[in-house]
Amino acid sequence: MSQQFKYVVRIFGQDVDGTMKLPYALAMVKGIGYNTAKAIIRKLGMDPNARLGELSDAEVKKVESVISDHTIKGLPSWLYNRRKDYESGLDLHLVTSDLIFYVRNDIEREKKSRSWRGVRHSLGLKVRGQRTRTTGRTGMTIGVARKKAAQPQSQQSSSQQQKSS
């Protein structure tokens, strides 16, 4: 353990609070969830109750190097976030900008192939079979406020008609 406690630690180009416990701190990185973080910490033999700021620079580099290889040896394949990659066929675990890039490419590939999912993406509709009759609406809403605003005007016009007769 390092003598100096760091309140802000930079992991994968992201500033993370050093007072957080290791699994929660690693879960702040895009592409790493709590369960994956726990598995990585267990694989490295670190204490899951330790704070991120207590780690030395070498230990932080060790965590980064294990995750940046895209395959974490010794972890089950169902824990990876990209199984059977389209181009390579390998099980990968992607983080940060790599994950964003691959997901964007997947969506563009589906749009080009004009698959059902690609068509839904291109139309800006829900993709995974959700109902769309009432939820997921976008744009301007014509709500109750217009109806209420119309009611006083109709009452005024009816009162004017009564006065004129």
Swiss-Prot record:
SUPFAM superfamilies cross-referenced by the UniProt entry: S13-like H2TH domain
Matching PROSITE patterns: RIBOSOMAL_S13_1, RIBOSOMAL_S13_2
Protein's GO biological process: translation
Species per Swiss-Prot/TrEMBL record: Saccharolobus solfataricus (strain ATCC 35092 / DSM 1617 / JCM 11322 / P2)
Pfam families named in the record: Ribosomal_S13
NCBIfam families xref list: PRK04053.1, uS13_arch
Entry similarity comment: Belongs to the universal ribosomal protein uS13 family.
Transmembrane spans: none
Name of the protein: Small ribosomal subunit protein uS13
Assigned GO CC terms: cytosol; small ribosomal subunit
Protein purpose: Located at the top of the head of the 30S subunit, it contacts several helices of the 16S rRNA. In the 70S ribosome it contacts the 23S rRNA (bridge B1a) and protein L5 of the 50S subunit (bridge B1b), connecting the 2 subunits; these bridges are implicated in subunit movement.
UniProt gene name: rps13
